Amino acid sequence: MEELERLKTRKREIEKELEDFVPKDSLIFTIPGIGKTLGCIILARVGDVRRFKKRFVAYCGLDPVVESSGKSVVSRGISKRGDAVLRRAFYLAALTAIKVNPVIKRFYEEHKGRLKGKKLITACARKLAVITWAVLYYNKPFDASE
């Protein structure tokens, strides 16, 4: 029990340090599904999002791999060439966003007939990465109607 209390105390200390690192009014926190911890991880790993014009999803390792030969085109999942920590952060955020973010929830419902399980959650993570890029790049809070 002492070990559990020590770990809880350490967790609170780390969360406090994260709050000092990232301003509370950062626009990433306007996105439903991205909380304090994951938001801080994403901001720390990405830095300035303006350096990504088109390749943010690839930097996160969530870009699709498409193989083509002749007339056939086959999708082979995600590349996994990007930042593994970011990929994991967006995956975890997507698990929550499916429940609380109306855009991700709608995306999930539209695609669950075609995709299953982890592939569908990964697709939601990619969508969440695109939303995160747009919010940070254009410096506008999340708006589900856009």
Language model segments and positions:
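A detector of single, family-specific signature residues
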Residues: 1-146
